[in-house]
């Protein structure tokens, strides 16, 4: 179960990166709540990069190349889409403070987006934070069938190519478990995170 660690409206990008390095991440009660609080789950969602699983049906869809997959071309649009309230997601924890913080992290090279495009339409995507050899997945959205799933596949491919060692999903969902996500005890996660933080910051972007 998630354990809030207190509210702090004065969070800077530097404090945010430090928090990630010790196993904390921020959330808001709602999109309308200006405050954010730290979360440290007792069980941490992790998607092992060496045990990532793709279903046959999804693999077939990927071979058909239904979308143009891009990295970091419209980060702000991705986080805005993740923050939208939809019929399947009536509430969201992404408030204006979080959007501003992660936009700054993007501009300094620590937050990244994977995007699915259909022509000039953004139809799916995800975003997260890179630090050391870890990538912390934050949120995803989909406006077309399988768009976010395909973005996740491309994320994992890139992380493997760049020698990342940890893909943190914060929590697990039934959706993520189909890809191989597991619940990792906090102590075990802390050891894995510490090792990832010993690495220099790995490059996620092509630039």
Curated annotation (Swiss-Prot):
Functions in the N-end rule pathway of protein degradation where it conjugates Leu, Phe and, less efficiently, Met from aminoacyl-tRNAs to the N-termini of proteins containing an N-terminal arginine or lysine. The gene is aat. This is Leucyl/phenylalanyl-tRNA--protein transferase. It is found in: Cytoplasm. It comes from Rhizobium rhizogenes (strain K84 / ATCC BAA-868) (Agrobacterium radiobacter). GO terms for biological process: protein catabolic process. One of its GO terms (molecular function) is leucyl-tRNA--protein transferase activity. It comes from the Bacteria. Its EC number is 2.3.2.6. Pfam families: Leu_Phe_trans (PF03588). GO terms for cellular component: cytoplasm. It catalyses: N-terminal L-lysyl-[protein] + L-leucyl-tRNA(Leu) = N-terminal L-leucyl-L-lysyl-[protein] + tRNA(Leu) + H(+); N-terminal L-arginyl-[protein] + L-leucyl-tRNA(Leu) = N-terminal L-leucyl-L-arginyl-[protein] + tRNA(Leu) + H(+); L-phenylalanyl-tRNA(Phe) + an N-terminal L-alpha-aminoacyl-[protein] = an N-terminal L-phenylalanyl-L-alpha-aminoacyl-[protein] + tRNA(Phe). Belongs to the L/F-transferase family. SUPFAM superfamilies: Acyl-CoA N-acyltransferases (Nat). Keywords: Acyltransferase, Cytoplasm, Transferase.
